[in-house]
């Protein structure tokens, strides 16, 4: 104790004696205070437990309840008089008043011969499974309690039946609040008199990637995302050297999502501006020859004020036409893909024009 005070060694003998006694008194006071607090806490906890379990009896374990039931020779029946009315429970102020609490406790004791047992069994019933509820139904003694238990049992049985035998969605649809047109369609489906129309697959996704393009992409390394974007029969303007461009009308594109957001912004800013060159790209033909081209957007306005716009491959298209022997009436397909982020196109010719070119 003396080690807690740094100046204890510097005191005189009489001073040390006085301080030692003072320390002893302080320690005794602290111990006494702790003991009083501990006893007060124990008393308050016991009083609160007595008060709680007086109003709401402690729930017994299921094994004890079953043992009591066997000793009594059967299930203890639920009666309306055996259940305590929660509205008659005393309030805090009434419990503090000894006169009112004694009279009301007698009333609670007289309301049931076994209040604790009935409350335990009531809680036990709600916590047990549906099998225990079915057993309890075998010996109901009160109309009120038996009707409540019977309604719960019927609800449980109905849920089981719904799980085992789910309702027919067709019958629900026919009997529900639907329009006459929907009911007629469902009736046709059920009787087999209604058939769905066959829809032709989208041409952009129906065709597989050509084998020659697969080989080209494999040789280029890191090439991916091949998609068919355009098919066309060449016109005179497409092979005219003075035009030097392949026109791809936007409305005729099979897919229009082959550009990145940056490329779309560049092309939009370069509309009908000859000083801007557009977006650079690579075009590959069926001979695996690569050509440098530019993609631009041209807007065509009509006298009515309405207009349309096209994608055009320029700056190198004449070389592609000459090398592949393209002429008016030839059918071509244009594919797009990416190689390390660079926009690439692949041109596939019809078999007849390709044979002439190879000769």
Curated annotation (Swiss-Prot):
Name assigned to this protein: Putative B3 domain-containing protein At3g24850
GO molecular function: DNA binding
Residue segments, region Disordered: 92-111, 159-192
Domain of life, per lineage: Eukaryota
Compartments it resides in: Nucleus
Species: Arabidopsis thaliana (Mouse-ear cress)
One GO cellular component term: nucleus
Keyword rRNA-binding among record annotations: no
A family per Pfam: At2g31720-like
Keyword Transcription regulation: yes
Biased composition (Polar residues): 100-111
């Amino acid at each position: 104790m003396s080690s807690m005070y740094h100046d204890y060694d510097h005191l005189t003998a009489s001073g040390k004696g006085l301080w030692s006694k003072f320390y002893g008194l302080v320690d005794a006071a602290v111990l006494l205070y702790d003991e009083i607090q501990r006893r007060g806490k124990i008393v308050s906890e016991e009083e609160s437990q007595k008060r709680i379990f007086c109003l709401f009896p402690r729930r017994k374990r299921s094994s004890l309840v079953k043992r009591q039931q066997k000793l009594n020779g059967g299930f203890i029946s639920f009666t309306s008089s055996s259940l305590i009315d929660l509205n008659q429970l005393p309030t805090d102020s009434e419990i503090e008043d000894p006169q009112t609490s004694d009279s009301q406790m007698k009333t609670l004791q007289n309301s049931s011969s076994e209040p604790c047992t009935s409350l335990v069994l009531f809680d036990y019933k709600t916590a047990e499974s549906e099998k225990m509820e079915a057993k309890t139904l075998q010996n109901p003694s009160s109309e009120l309690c038996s009707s409540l238990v019977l309604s719960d049992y019927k609800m449980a049985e109905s849920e089981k039946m719904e799980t085992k035998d789910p309702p027919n969605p067709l019958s629900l649809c026919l009997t529900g609040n639907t329009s006459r047109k929907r009911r007629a369609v469902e009736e046709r489906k059920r009787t087999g008199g209604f058939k769905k129309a066959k829809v032709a697959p989208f041409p952009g996704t129906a065709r597989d990637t050509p084998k020659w393009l697969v080989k080209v992409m494999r040789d280029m390394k890191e090439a991916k995302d091949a998609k068919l974007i355009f098919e066309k029969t060449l016109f005179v303007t497409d092979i005219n050297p003075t035009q030097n461009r392949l026109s791809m009308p936007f409305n005729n594109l099979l897919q229009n999502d082959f550009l990145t957001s940056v490329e779309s912004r560049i092309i939009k800013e370069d509309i009908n501006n000859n000083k801007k060159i557009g977006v650079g790209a690579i075009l590959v033909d069926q001979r695996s020859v690569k050509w440098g081209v530019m993609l631009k957007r041209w807007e065509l306005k009509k006298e009515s004020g309405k207009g349309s716009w096209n994608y055009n491959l320029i700056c190198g298209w004449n070389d592609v036409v000459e090398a592949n022997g393209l002429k008016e009436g030839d059918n071509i397909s244009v594919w797009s893909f990416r190689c390390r982020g660079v926009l690439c196109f692949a041109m596939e010719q019809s078999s007849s024009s390709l044979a002439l070119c190879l000769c």
